[in-house]
Structures are given as C-alpha cells and as structure tokens.
C-alpha cells in the first residue's frame, strides 16, 4: 500500500508539473515581446480587478478588444494572446476574473482549483468586471472609441453573453464557447457575433444549430466557422510546440479570419 501511495503521489506530482510547465512556451514568447505591457487595478463597487493591458506599436489611435480568458484563469497563454492582438494593431485588455482580496489566478495551487473557482463565479459579477474594463477602455487616450469582446472556452460563452449585456460593442468573437439557451439571451445584441469552433469538439459543436436558430429568429448576425479536425481549445493547443497538425492549421486559419474581421472595427 505504501508503494502504491508513493507511485500515485509521484504521478500526481508529475501531472501537476506538466500542467505548470505546459505554457512555458507562451511565457517565453511574451518575454520577447517589444510591446508595452502593464497591470492596472480596476475598481468598482467593493471589487478590485487585476487587469493585464497590452498596447500596439502604432501611429494612430486603436480599437480596444476585451479578452475573456479560459476557464483556467488569466494564464501565460491568455497574456500572450493579448500580446498577439497588440501585434496585430489593437489594444488588448484582459481582466483576471479570479481577482479577489489578496488573490488572483496565480494564487490557486493547481488548474483544478482555478476551474472550480471560475465555475462558481456569478454571471452578474463577471459582467460587472467586464463593464469596469469597458469603462477603462473608453477613457484610454490611445483608444479610438471602438470596443469589441472576445472569449475562449468558458470565456467564449461569457463573450456571447456580454454581447447581449453591452450594446456598445462593435463585434463579439466567440472561440469554442457555448451559445445562448433562450431567445432572451440575444434580444439586446447589437453587434455581429463571429464563432470559431473545432470539428472534433462535439460538446460545443452540438450547440451551434440551436444558436443559429435563436440568432436567426431574433434577426441577429451570427457567423460560425468550423475548423476540420480541430479539438476544443485549438487556439492554445495549436500554438503549443507539440500541436497536432489539425489544431495548428485551425489556429493559423482562425487567426487569418480573425485579423480580417478585426479590420472592420
């Protein structure tokens, strides 16, 4: 029994280490970036939201994209994704939705703990945090007044919901997140919603027909694209050193589509 416990403990430690080190490549890319990154504290009500901001190196004022992170929290990949948005010419603002007194994503001991905490976040709190980020964006001197939202995984679902919450958005980019459940979830959407989905992500893919129906019935613009052979999380997985060919192709193709859509802001 002692040997079995030891082996189990080693396996858990190895898994935890793998999880911790899995985004070292993203951290390394971010550290090489020439762009300006900064942390700001966004205060609203009794909350202070730790927020990561990246600025593009451009001559003119730029649109702002609010980034809603995955269910794992504000990871190195999420920060690197924000930097990539800035490289494309956009100001990226990423609130750490796990912010709490004395805590943020980095405070959680492992991925499972972060997932559990995020899953318990009230939608009203999430939208209030995003509102604080949107208000901050509106005050930024280098911003041109155009605001969009994007989200990934859990954040993709929240991006869809935030489009219904904030009528000032110019666009919403939903990456493999669940869609609306009822008609009331889309009635206030005033911007186009663009979806990015993996063919091998049946859990989310199964929701697309219902989302299409709800959006069409409400007269809203919803344009989903499904990427062949890609799984859930392909924007992150497709950029990793060990990316599968399908995820890598989906990542690259989605980025090209996304950049073309961003130019409409």
Which sequence ranges carry the predicted segments?
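Serine-hydrolase catalytic machinery in alpha/beta-hydrolase-like enzymes
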Residues: 30-33, 39-138, 236-240
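Alpha/beta-hydrolase fold nucleophile elbow
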Residues: 141-152
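Gly/Ala-rich beta-loop-alpha elbow adjacent to hydrolase catalytic centers
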Residues: 151-155, 159
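Short beta-strand/loop motif that positions the catalytic acidic residue
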Residues: 189, 195-197
């Amino acid at each position: 029994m002692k040997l079995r416990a030891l082996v189990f403990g080693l396996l858990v430690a190895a898994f935890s280490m793998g999880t911790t080190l899995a985004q070292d490549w993203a951290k390394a890319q971010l550290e090489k970036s020439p762009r300006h990154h900064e942390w700001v504290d966004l205060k609203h009500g009794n909350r202070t939201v730790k927020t990561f901001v990246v600025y593009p190196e451009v001559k003119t004022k730029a649109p702002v994209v609010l980034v809603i992170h995955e269910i794992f929290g504000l990871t190195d990949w999420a920060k690197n994704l924000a930097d990539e948005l800035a490289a494309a010419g956009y100001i990226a603002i990423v609130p750490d939705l796990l912010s709490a007194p004395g805590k943020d994503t980095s405070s959680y001991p492992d991925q499972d703990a972060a997932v559990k905490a995020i899953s318990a976040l009230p939608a009203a709190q999430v939208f209030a945090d995003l509102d604080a980020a949107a208000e901050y964006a509106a005050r930024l001197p280098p911003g041109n007044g155009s605001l969009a939202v994007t989200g990934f995984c859990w954040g993709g679902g929240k991006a869809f919901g935030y489009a219904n919450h904030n009528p000032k958005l110019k666009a919403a980019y939903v990456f493999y997140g669940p869609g609306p459940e009822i008609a009331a979830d889309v009635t206030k959407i005033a911007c186009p919603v663009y979806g990015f989905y993996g063919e091998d992500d049946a859990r989310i893919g199964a929701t697309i027909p219902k989302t299409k129906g709800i959006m069409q019935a409400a007269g809203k613009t919803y344009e989903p694209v499904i990427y062949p052979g890609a799984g859930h999380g392909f924007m992150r997985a497709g950029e990793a050193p060990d990316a599968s060919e399908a995820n890598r192709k989906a990542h690259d193709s989605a980025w090209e589509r996304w950049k073309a859509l961003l130019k409409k802001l």
